[in-house]
Amino acid sequence: MRCLPVFIILLLLIASAPSFDALPKTEDNVPLSSFHDNLKRTRRIHLNIRECCSDGWCCPAG
């Protein structure tokens, strides 16, 4: 019975703890999801260039 008040106090402390962001962030506090979006966009651009370059007429110089 002595543990019950301690248990209740611990539950109250846990419930009142500050919440945290669900999205992981980098050192600059930028959501990591934005970096994943940039990676997807870059991959899509490179894939489009490869499809375009298979014909050989629309490849960018370089």
UniProtKB/Swiss-Prot annotation:
Residues cleaved off as propeptide: 20-49
InterPro entries listed in its UniProt record: T-conotoxin
Signal peptide: 1-19
Cellular compartments per GO CC: extracellular region
Tissue: Expressed by the venom duct.
Tagged with keyword Hydrolase: no
Cell location: Secreted
Disulfide links within the chain: none
Any one GO molecular-function label of the UniProt entry: toxin activity
Domain of life of the native organism: Eukaryota
Alanine amide sites (modified residues): 61
Post-translation changes: Contains 2 disulfide bonds that can be either 'C1-C3, C2-C4' or 'C1-C4, C2-C3', since these disulfide connectivities have been observed for conotoxins with cysteine framework V (for examples, see AC P0DQQ7 and AC P81755).
Main location per the UniProt record: secreted
Domain remarks in the Swiss-Prot or TrEMBL record: The cysteine framework is V (CC-CC).
Entry similarity comment: Belongs to the conotoxin T superfamily.
Protein name per UniProt: Conotoxin Pn-B02
Source organism (scientific name): Conus pennaceus
Lineage: Eukaryota, Metazoa, Spiralia, Lophotrochozoa, Mollusca
